[in-house]
Amino acid sequence: MEVTTRLTWNDENHLRKLLGNVSLSLLYKSSVHGGSIEDMVERCSRQGCTITMAYIDYNMIVAFMLGNYINLHESSTEPNDSLWFSLQKKNDTTEIETLLLNTAPKIIDEQLVCRLSKTDIFIICRDNKIYLDKMITRNLKLRFYGHRQYLECEVFRVEGIKDNLDDIKRIIKAREHRNRLLADIRDYRPYADLVSEIRILLVGPVGSGKSSFFNSVKSIFHGHVTGQAVVGSDITSITERYRIYSVKDGKNGKSLPFMLCDTMGLDGAEGAGLCMDDIPHILKGCMPDRYQFNSRKPITPEHSTFITSPSLKDRIHCVAYVLDINSIDNLYSKMLAKVKQVHKEVLNCGIAYVALLTKVDDCSEVLQDNFLNMSRSMTSQSRVMNVHKMLGIPISNILMVGNYASDLELDPMKDILILSALRQMLRAADDFLEDLPLEETGAIERALQPCI
């Protein structure tokens, strides 16, 4: 008779998002294999990485993950890392909380016991009961502590990861840092409330990843990969209209305090790509959303939707030069000249700027262990220095990301780079706002000089 798990497809999918691309194989099911702890351990020992799940009710699962179920009849004094998590269904959503501990289970009096500092924190008891200490329930945000009956206990072998939890621990810590970055950006407010939303201009060569960066930011805040902005190729620009994209916090959430402005790509050929005479109008806020670009003719004040008196909120507050990290060393002279021409206009307007190096192959290698800074390899370091020399951008404002292009699922490492870059852009924009002359900051509602 085939033994089937109580774990739903939806719950298993949430675990894959938590742990990465893994598969689960059922080793033990208490209602089929019996409730003896010794039998469970014997069946699950020497199986590599495992997850032990206790189904508290139909809406709550408590589980722990081990790098290996050691032979618990043998004495062992070595501590063992374990990952604890809870899955709780609330209002048609599944919430997951995690906790990393340095403890290993042992059989004591026919019970499976985990101790921390000589205190029992978790026990799988006889008669389908478990015990959870307050420390566990508080960290996992459970609504109970102490003894509780469970419906079923199952143990799975986790395939697709190593037999230690180092990779998983890094993923969990990455998710925690990612969530802190999300919270920082959600709580962000532009300097002195001079504007309600920061406008960030994405400009760079054709195919460098401008539209993909917007899609990536939106994907993170929506919780799944999206593709609102159509993405072009490395040869021809598909962005033909100026777009001012807002980003909502979730599908039906409120708009976040920034906008990403997407442009036609720069092209080294004459009469192709973004018209260079459009740049000042974009920077000063004269170009309307959905304006149809013309590579050979810039927008003029005679255009029906030209914004003749842009206010501070209409202007660009930070420019991101989007460059393919793999092509920086091979930028041909005409393309480099156009990038420098854009940069000259940005400097003339006094606008903040950063460089965004896209198409990073391995985001996990770029991040330092604490996720706070980027660990640059010799190759990436040389390209960063090349951009620094070309445009004079401070090294701290040269950022690396890997956009969501062909991915189907979100990656916490990739999210951290994207969110860190976005946060740095917002900080740069704050510097720009703080440095504005008093005649502008003192009368924000007053229209600025006509952009002609």
UniProtKB/Swiss-Prot annotation:
List each copy of the TLDc domain by range: 1-159
Q: GO biological process annotations for this chain's record?
A: defense response to virus; immune response
Disulfides per UniProt: none
Chief location: cytoplasm
Which compartments does it reside in? Cytoplasm
The record ties this protein, via Gene3D superfamilies, to: P-loop containing nucleotide triphosphate hydrolases
Naming one, the record's GO cellular component terms include: cytosol
Q: Which InterPro entries match?
A: P-loop_NTPase, TLDc_dom
Q: Its induction, per UniProt? A: By type I interferons. By M.tuberculosis infection.
Record flagged with keyword Cytoplasm: yes
Q: What is its quaternary makeup?
A: Interacts with FKBP5; this interaction modulates IKBKB and IKBKE kinase activities.
Give the function comment from the record.
Type I interferon-stimulated gene (ISG) that plays a critical role in antiviral and antibacterial activity. During bacterial infection, promotes macrophage differentiation and facilitates inflammatory cytokine secretion. Plays a role in the control of respiratory syncytial virus/RSV infection, reducing the ability of the virus to replicate. Exhibits a low antiviral activity against hepatitis C virus. Also acts as a feedback regulator of IFN responses by negatively regulating IKBKB and IKBKE kinase activities through interaction with FKBP5.
The Swiss-Prot or TrEMBL record describes its family as follows: Belongs to the IFI44 family.
Which named protein is this? Interferon-induced protein 44-like
Q: Which organism is it from?
A: Homo sapiens (Human)
